[in-house]
Amino acid sequence: MVCIPCIVIPVLLWVYKRFLEPVLYPIISPIISRFWRKTPLQDTPQQKTSTAECNGAANGSTANGPKTVADKKAD
């Protein structure tokens, strides 16, 4: 058995999106846009690049190095 809110909430959301939003959005949108303006993006300063060399190893391991096999649980 499905709980009542699991049925009612999607139906109410569908009614809102289908019927109420087309009527309410043109009224509410100008009011919201006055308070919630988009601010222009600001340029961030360039970060200093690191002078350390990269040898291609991640955490000290290499792709061509020795491979260890994980222990499998014996039944």
UniProtKB/Swiss-Prot annotation:
Residues 43-65 have a biased composition (Polar residues). Keywords: Endoplasmic reticulum, Lipid droplet. It holds the Pfam family DUF4512. It comes from the Eukaryota. Transmembrane segments: none annotated. Residues 1-37 are annotated as: Necessary for its localzation to the endoplasmic reticulum and lipid droplets. Residues 43-75 are annotated as: Disordered. Belongs to the UPF0729 family. This is UPF0729 protein C18orf32 homolog. It comes from Danio rerio (Zebrafish).
